[in-house]
Amino acid sequence: MSEPRQILVTSALPYANGSIHLGHMLEYIQTDMWVRFQKLRGNQCIYVCADDAHGSAIMLRAEKEGITPEQLIANVQAEHSSDFADFLVDFDNFHSTHSDENRELSSLIYSRLREAGHIATRSVTQYFDPEKGMFLADRFIKGTCPKCAAEDQYGDNCEKCGATYAPTELKNPKSAISGATPVLRDSQHFFFKLPDFQAMLQQWTRSGTLQDAVANKLAEWLDSGLQEWDISRDAPYFGFEIPGEPGKYFYVWLDAPIGYMASFKNLCARRPELDFDAFWHEGSKAELYHFIGKDIVNFHALFWPAMLEGAGFRKPTAVNVHGYLTVNGAKMSKSRGTFIKARTYLDHLQPEYLRYYYAAKLGRGVDDLDLNLEDFVQKVNSDLVGKVVNIASRCAGFIHKGNEGVMVGGDAAPELTEAFLAAAPSIAEAYEARDFGRAMREIMALADRANAWIADKAPWSLAKQEGKQDEVQAICAQGINLFRQLVIFLKPVLPVLAADAEAFLNVAPLTWNDHLTRLENHQLNPFKALMSRIEPAKVEAMVAASKEDLLAAEAKAPAGNGELAKDPLSAEIEFDTFAAVDLRVALIVKAEAVAGADKLLQLTLDIGDERRNVFSGIKSAYPDPSKLEGRLTMMVANLKPRKMRFGVSEGMVMAAGPGGEEIYLLSPDSGAKPGQRIK
């Protein structure tokens, strides 16, 4: 038998500036399931996390609420801890980046990087708020977009036209904090020389530490050449002051990942059997895994391993990246009630419903996961109540009535027992690979076989026949043993169901290897309902409560002046209505003005195997139509041809904007090809 593995696991640190929602929970639930699986297998697996508790946003929110930043992060940490615990996320330690351990480790790593020559200093020019007496991050500056002239845009990118730019390019800049006009000032900043680690990162990112899609994306960064990373911020700032540099603070993204180390070090102080160095020092034999979302890959797969390498610590064994959560096929929406906080969910539904649904849909890739609320109800009710729990509820009564709760009768279905045993390695392999969806499919296939076998044997019919009691007992004992196997396989996902099943089965906490054994001549406890069906009305109430959360927030906020306020969303449509529209990528082969028409351009579009003639009212925005030639755009390809005075228009190109000169032709991402369907 192999030695137990030593494994340290982390999830990304939630920011201590707001509530946990179901999108966040996607990460913590999948990490918790993987950790529980490792522990079930007998491995030493430690799961640590912490609140990310530094930064200007926290400082400013605390000021707005009239409390100290320390009070704010303590309040948020209590809320986060409660939400995680009630969702059955079982951290070995949930700490804070605002801790003594994190201060010491951040200073240590910085000093080692500086001594090794990996820190540079130079003056940078930034906007400064003269009223607040502070330098402004890009997101705290608003003004007019230098590209499209849209107002009220952030200091780094325009939400209207998508342009990116330096804050100094923004027209009519204003501080989003005070409303004052910012002034430019110079300040000395500290930079981490990330290019020093280019060769190491090129090798490390291709060494199996990342999913292929993630490694390919990072290759784009690496191929274009890495830039030095600004790791300092000026006072006032809530965080750790850089040693020996009064008024200079570590940027939140420097000390945040060090929070993984700090949380583990804090745990080591309370658990003497744990050795910090054994897990973190260079050459460590322990395994280290980070679970993160795809939005923070660059920090965890470029900056973080480079910092560790430069400071003489070990690098992660792997960084496991996941996609975003959508609800009912769309981005979470406060107006539709699908931006659901963890606590709002818990006020209406059991946590294991969502744990199972996430498990059933999670693969090992970085694709987004959709929480379809109708499918959620159907799948949980069908799989967990209708299949798994149904086996126990079908069989338990006969054993209690016919034999006072004692299981007897031997193995009544050797071929089924063997099938369950044979499936265990594949299920374990799927769990290990984080392919939870595959594991759930294989487990439910076994549940289907067990239910079909019981239905075929029909103990309820045999119980009415004289002389069939022994057969009834053997069938039902077999059913309970199969149920026990399923509980073992599902235990990482459904810990409460497993604990309740263990109480019914009258057994000690089950381990993975218990699937190799059977219960014979064993006394059961009285059966109690293990899980109830989801009531659709409760899901509807949860959505309604989420809308109420929005109304409460809107009551406190000033009226918006964004694009939705100017042009509200249209009424909802059914998916089939949308699916009837055939959207395609199109190459603009030719573009020319239409004689006698003030607004029209005539476009010749290549959509792969054919060309289309399209008239479009975009002339005011594109006075030189020849500049459109060679550009990819998007078109409605199945629009009925329309006869116009100038000819027949065979489709419609897609554009955004209010009209006139403010029309912006839409373009697909690089790599798209003419004729490809837009999905």
Curated annotation (Swiss-Prot):
<feature type="short sequence motif" description="'HIGH' region">
    <location>
        <begin position="14"/>
        <end position="24"/>
    </location>
</feature>
<feature type="binding site">
    <location>
        <position position="334"/>
    </location>
    <ligand>
        <name>ATP</name>
    </ligand>
</feature>
<comment type="subunit">
    <text>Homodimer.</text>
</comment>
<dbReference type="InterPro" id="IPR041872">
    <property type="entry name" value="Anticodon_Met"/>
</dbReference>
<dbReference type="InterPro" id="IPR004495">
    <property type="entry name" value="Met-tRNA-synth_bsu_C"/>
</dbReference>
<dbReference type="InterPro" id="IPR023458">
    <property type="entry name" value="Met-tRNA_ligase_1"/>
</dbReference>
<keyword id="KW-0694">RNA-binding</keyword>
<feature type="binding site">
    <location>
        <position position="148"/>
    </location>
    <ligand>
        <name>Zn(2+)</name>
    </ligand>
</feature>
<dbReference type="GO" id="GO:0006431">
    <property type="term" value="P:methionyl-tRNA aminoacylation"/>
</dbReference>
<comment type="similarity">
    <text>Belongs to the class-I aminoacyl-tRNA synthetase family. MetG type 1 subfamily.</text>
</comment>
<keyword id="KW-0862">Zinc</keyword>
<dbReference type="GO" id="GO:0046872">
    <property type="term" value="F:metal ion binding"/>
</dbReference>
<keyword id="KW-0479">Metal-binding</keyword>
<keyword id="KW-0648">Protein biosynthesis</keyword>
<feature type="binding site">
    <location>
        <position position="158"/>
    </location>
    <ligand>
        <name>Zn(2+)</name>
    </ligand>
</feature>
<dbReference type="InterPro" id="IPR002547">
    <property type="entry name" value="tRNA-bd_dom"/>
</dbReference>
<keyword id="KW-0547">Nucleotide-binding</keyword>
<dbReference type="InterPro" id="IPR009080">
    <property type="entry name" value="tRNAsynth_Ia_anticodon-bd"/>
</dbReference>
<dbReference type="GO" id="GO:0005829">
    <property type="term" value="C:cytosol"/>
</dbReference>
<dbReference type="InterPro" id="IPR001412">
    <property type="entry name" value="aa-tRNA-synth_I_CS"/>
</dbReference>
<keyword id="KW-0963">Cytoplasm</keyword>
<keyword id="KW-0067">ATP-binding</keyword>
<dbReference type="InterPro" id="IPR014758">
    <property type="entry name" value="Met-tRNA_synth"/>
</dbReference>
<feature type="binding site">
    <location>
        <position position="161"/>
    </location>
    <ligand>
        <name>Zn(2+)</name>
    </ligand>
</feature>
<keyword id="KW-0030">Aminoacyl-tRNA synthetase</keyword>
<feature type="short sequence motif" description="'KMSKS' region">
    <location>
        <begin position="331"/>
        <end position="335"/>
    </location>
</feature>
<comment type="function">
    <text>Is required not only for elongation of protein synthesis but also for the initiation of all mRNA translation through initiator tRNA(fMet) aminoacylation.</text>
</comment>
<feature type="domain" description="tRNA-binding">
    <location>
        <begin position="577"/>
        <end position="679"/>
    </location>
</feature>
<keyword id="KW-0820">tRNA-binding</keyword>
<dbReference type="GO" id="GO:0005524">
    <property type="term" value="F:ATP binding"/>
</dbReference>
<dbReference type="InterPro" id="IPR033911">
    <property type="entry name" value="MetRS_core"/>
</dbReference>
<keyword id="KW-0436">Ligase</keyword>
<dbReference type="Pfam" id="PF09334">
    <property type="entry name" value="tRNA-synt_1g"/>
</dbReference>
<dbReference type="InterPro" id="IPR014729">
    <property type="entry name" value="Rossmann-like_a/b/a_fold"/>
</dbReference>
<dbReference type="GO" id="GO:0000049">
    <property type="term" value="F:tRNA binding"/>
</dbReference>
<dbReference type="GO" id="GO:0004825">
    <property type="term" value="F:methionine-tRNA ligase activity"/>
</dbReference>
<dbReference type="InterPro" id="IPR029038">
    <property type="entry name" value="MetRS_Zn"/>
</dbReference>
<dbReference type="Pfam" id="PF19303">
    <property type="entry name" value="Anticodon_3"/>
</dbReference>
<protein>
    <recommendedName>
        <fullName>Methionine--tRNA ligase</fullName>
        <ecNumber>6.1.1.10</ecNumber>
    </recommendedName>
</protein>
<dbReference type="Pfam" id="PF01588">
    <property type="entry name" value="tRNA_bind"/>
</dbReference>
<dbReference type="InterPro" id="IPR015413">
    <property type="entry name" value="Methionyl/Leucyl_tRNA_Synth"/>
</dbReference>
<dbReference type="InterPro" id="IPR012340">
    <property type="entry name" value="NA-bd_OB-fold"/>
</dbReference>
